[in-house]
From Swiss-Prot:
One of its GO terms (molecular function) is methionyl-tRNA formyltransferase activity. InterPro entries: Fmt (IPR005794), Formyl_trans_C (IPR005793), Formyl_trans_C_sf (IPR037022), Formyl_transf_N (IPR002376), Formyl_transf_N_sf (IPR036477), Formyl_transferase-like_C_sf (IPR011034), GART_AS (IPR001555), Met-tRNA-FMT_C (IPR044135). It catalyses: L-methionyl-tRNA(fMet) + (6R)-10-formyltetrahydrofolate = N-formyl-L-methionyl-tRNA(fMet) + (6S)-5,6,7,8-tetrahydrofolate + H(+). This is Methionyl-tRNA formyltransferase. It comes from the Bacteria. GO terms for cellular component: cytosol. Keywords: Protein biosynthesis, Transferase. Attaches a formyl group to the free amino group of methionyl-tRNA(fMet). The formyl group appears to play a dual role in the initiator identity of N-formylmethionyl-tRNA by promoting its recognition by IF2 and preventing the misappropriation of this tRNA by the elongation apparatus. CDD domains: FMT_core_Met-tRNA-FMT_N, Met_tRNA_FMT_C. The keyword Secreted does not apply. Its EC number is 2.1.2.9.
Amino acid sequence: MIKLLFMGTPQFSATVLKGLLDNPAYEILGVVTQPDRAVGRKKDIKVTPVKQLALEHGISIYQPEKLSGSQELIEIMGLGADGIITAAFGQFLPTLLLDSVSFAINVHASLLPKYRGGAPIHYAIMNGDKEAGVTIMEMIKEMDAGDMVAKASTPILETDNVGTLFEKLAIIGRDLLLDSLPAYLSGELKPIPQDHSQATFSPNISPEQEKLDWTMSNQEVFSHIRGMNPWPVAHTFLEGQRLKIYEAQLAEGEGLPGQVIVKTKKSLVIATGQGALSLIVVQPAGKPKMSIIDFLNGIGRKLEVGDIIGR
């Protein structure tokens, strides 16, 4: 039985961890995940999906704010793991830790060397890519730059958003890891170096990126909205108040960027730099998420054809 240390945080990571837990070839000695966070207006404490799964299986949990130089690092290195598996962990691993194990493998949600970094799925959708994927790679000190063990891809559908693609890629990543790890550990599967000249990066989404630019084409704005749903969520402005936009559909029509060109009891169509978008699900400031019909029956009632949003 191969003894592993698992490191990860979101549901993507938990799906990979569950696959390892269900496989008798591996023993998880401990998991390292991000600290619990206070979320929402009530500041409720939320544990990570990886921590929740570890609690259910009675696995030792470590949650350092920063792994490097921490007491947890000393404890983790004392576990005697053969190797490390990471998936969307969110921190660099100290060289001391990498050198203490026989192997360290990362499950990364992109087709490397494209989209190294923390938000590959967001960028794949926002950039209008036709496919996304997962790469199993060796871990080195440089971010997502290690040799590649295996790759798998899947089409990005127009119905996909970050949430749906996360779910698909988590399953692909889990299965790809479990399929490739035995051959990798036996030496049968030889890792392939990345072409570093082709590397692109996907840094964490900034607040500025959340704001929609109505001068872009309708396809670009459509991709941007999907690439922010369900988090951090794209937004525009209506009378100086933030209006989050969760879902929209491509539509025909022309007008000034951000201009209301169609308004009925059931639809609101906004012009873009090329074409238009019909808004489907929105969230006004201080209100819950709602259908466009409910929005038009409330705050959106005063909107008229010719009005411009986003200012």
